[in-house]
């Protein structure tokens, strides 16, 4: 019986989903000069909580999107793709890591969390 559970968890390990993160509510009350750095930290915190991994890697395009309007004027929302992947590095502490990439959208209206087929 433990084998079946183990096999199921292995299949569920590698997954990719799209989320909309409301940065506005996460940055409420944060000083101007700390907004963009805090936004990146909050994105990492969100990804870590959702995917259950401590190793979270942010794509440079997402970082550029967050910082695009400056340190003070962070976008209200961002659409991201969270991909939980296997760590190929043999001497890594964690077996899995999460890659957070930016998904450009014209409007956030009606968007929901959706599973994405692995590329």
UniProtKB/Swiss-Prot annotation:
Gene3D superfamilies, per database record: 3.10.440.10
Family, as annotated: Belongs to the eukaryotic ribosomal protein eL31 family.
GO terms (BP aspect): cytoplasmic translation
Presence of the UniProt keyword Ribonucleoprotein in the record: yes
Name of the featured protein: Large ribosomal subunit protein eL31
Keywords, ordered alphabetically: Ribonucleoprotein, Ribosomal protein
SMART domains given in the database record: Ribosomal_L31e
Stored InterPro entries: Ribosomal_eL31 (IPR000054), Ribosomal_eL31_CS (IPR020052), Ribosomal_eL31_dom_sf (IPR023621)
Keyword Cell membrane: no
Biological source species: Cyanophora paradoxa
Pfam family, one: Ribosomal_L31e
Gene that specifies this protein: RPL31
GO molecular function terms listed in the Swiss-Prot or TrEMBL record: structural constituent of ribosome
GO cellular component, one term: cytosolic large ribosomal subunit
Domain of life: Eukaryota
């Amino acid at each position: 019986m433990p084998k079946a559970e183990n096999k199921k968890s292995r299949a569920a390990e590698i997954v990719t989903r799209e989320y909309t993160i409301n940065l506005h509510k996460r940055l409420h009350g944060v000083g101007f000069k700390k907004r963009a750095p805090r936004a990146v930290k909050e994105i990492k915190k969100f990804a870590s909580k959702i995917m259950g991994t401590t190793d979270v890697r942010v794509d440079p395009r997402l970082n550029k999107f967050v910082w695009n309007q400056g340190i003070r004027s962070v976008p209200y929302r961002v659409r991201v793709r969270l991909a939980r992947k296997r760590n190929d590095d043999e001497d890594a502490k964690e077996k899995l890591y999460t890659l957070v990439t930016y998904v450009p959208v014209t409007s956030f209206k009606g968007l929901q969390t959706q599973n994405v087929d692995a590329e």
